Design a protein with these regions (language model features):
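Metal-dependent de-N-acetylase/amidase catalytic core
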Residues: 68-154
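Active-site rim/loop-helix segments in enzyme catalytic domains that contact anionic ligands
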Residues: 1-86, 116
Length: 154
């Protein structure tokens, strides 16, 4: 369960690649499947046999500047808890929001409050990109996400 389309590539891909015994599905707080970023990331993961679900909440960069969520956080929290309920384990953002991102903190808090066991990402994306992923991130498949993903490389 992640906040944004690029988060799973930045923070979770090495774990997903090295734990292929799990039946993965990726759940996104923001964007809809039909929006360009949602569509691109859904196609990327579909090539790897992984389904995605997008809750469609707005990814407003001003949320970070204002330190406040601009979407209906009560509705979002309910949807996160409901969509995570069938799962035995959730891989998600850590409580500090990885690097303090308000949307990441929100997702982490919702997963924690759901009571479902969780594994959290490391606090810095660089460790995640270099922890031994089996399959290299093919950035040419993610032109709309490339710039953000590259910010987390060494």
């Amino acid at each position: 369960m992640v906040a944004h389309p690029d988060d799973c590539v930045i923070f979770a891909k090495p774990f997903i690649d090295t734990h292929d015994q799990f039946d993965w599905q990726i759940l996104y707080l923001t964007y809809a499947q039909f929006e360009p970023r949602g569509k691109e990331i859904a196609e990327y993961w579909a090539k790897q046999g992984i389904l995605t679900t997008h809750l469609g909440f707005t990814d407003d960069y001003q949320d970070m500047e204002n330190n406040a969520l601009s979407f209906n956080h009560e509705q979002a929290a309910r949807e996160i808890v409901n969509i995570c309920q069938p799962y035995d384990l959730v891989l998600t953002h850590n409580p500090d929001g990885d690097y303090g991102h308000i949307h990441h903190k929100f997702v982490s808090q919702c997963v924690t409050e759901s009571g479902i066991p969780a594994i959290y990402f490391a606090s810095q994306g660089k460790e995640n990109l270099t922890c031994g992923a089996k399959n290299k991130v093919m950035l040419e498949d993610l032109p709309l996400h490339r710039e953000v993903i590259e910010q987390f490389k060494n």
